[in-house]
């Protein structure tokens, strides 16, 4: 999976880590695309950067995205507001790998204050190199979520009283 286009968005808390990840991705043969912040501003707000990165990722099939902030939590939530986005909070190599393999996540959120640069880069590498498994059981679940996103009708709860 070399040569991936990877859209990145970060607020001030993820700004420096984003710069490190961009350089790492370039050195690894990928094409990082910076969606901001473009300078360090302690008063910036993460939603614009994360929504932009997620919007561009969803609009570019086959691409991936990474959103960064202090914890990655709010950034992941913001990215998931974009219709069609599947953004997982990746706090380990295993969660990054499973996000791709089981959930076909196009984006991950990483906490810039939660990891060393070396740890974050191993998480990024796991994410960009792990393929989607295409397993039917995982696809069914993704389809259920996509249908809910489209219709806003919750799926029936198995075993629930009608």
Curated annotation (Swiss-Prot):
InterPro entries recorded: Rib-5-P_Isoase_Actino (IPR011860), RpiB_LacA_LacB (IPR003500), RpiB_LacA_LacB_sf (IPR036569)
One GO molecular-function entry: ribose-5-phosphate isomerase activity
Family from the record: Belongs to the LacAB/RpiB family.
Binding site for D-ribulose 5-phosphate: 11-12, 70-74, 103, 113, 137, 141
Function description: Catalyzes the interconversion of ribulose-5-P and ribose-5-P.
Pathway: Carbohydrate degradation; pentose phosphate pathway; D-ribose 5-phosphate from D-ribulose 5-phosphate (non-oxidative stage): step 1/1
Entry annotation: catalytic residues: 75, 102
Pfam entry (one): LacAB_rpiB
Organism domain of life: Bacteria
Record-given protein name: Ribose-5-phosphate isomerase B
One GO term of the biological process aspect: D-allose catabolic process
Miscellaneous comment in the UniProt entry for this protein: In mycobacterial enzymes, the usual proton acceptor is not a cysteine, but is remplaced by a glutamate.
Keyword terms, alphabetized: Carbohydrate metabolism, Isomerase
EC number, as in UniProt: 5.3.1.6
Reactions performed catalytically: aldehydo-D-ribose 5-phosphate = D-ribulose 5-phosphate
Assembly and binders: Homodimer.
Tagged with keyword Isomerase: yes
UniProt organism field: Mycobacterium leprae (strain TN)
